[in-house]
């Protein structure tokens, strides 16, 4: 009696970006909000949005939003850098074949000018993480008026 073995090779569902920023610049205005959108496909487990490492910008060092497959931000607010607490939000829509993640930074300041990154982690433990970076350029300035002659406080000029 002959025995036959059938070897079935299934290619893993690799993940990829469909709309990478590829380190391009996006302009945000002081006092306004800016939203970054990434579209992707494959077996993506988590989507992480964060600050690019200043020494090696291809790495994300400060996590701002951490979205699970169920669109739940599982990052404890206490882990978000102080300067960003209460000013960031993220959502994830779609399924394993095609998804989108949107991240919003509210009340932009000049200090927000830097690289931000989106990191996709695969469902497959043997899969590779991929990331994409975007540079936020901030425009606008504050003008401080004389309190005696022109009113109170600072006024935003954009």
PLM features per residue range, with description:
Residues 1-11:
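Cleavable N-terminal signal peptides of Sec/SRP-targeted secreted and luminal proteins
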Residues 9-34:
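N-terminal edge beta-strand
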Residues 34, 112-120:
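Conserved Ig-like domain signature around the intradomain disulfide
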Residues 73-111, 122-124:
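Extracellular beta-strand/loop-rich beta-sandwich domains predominantly from IgSF
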Residues 117-142:
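Extracellular/luminal immunoglobulin-like beta-sandwich modules
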Residues 38, 49, 116-118, 158:
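Core motif of extracellular immunoglobulin-like domains
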Residues 35-41:
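Short edge beta-strand/loop segments characteristic of extracellular beta-sandwich folds
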Residues 43-85:
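N-terminal V-set
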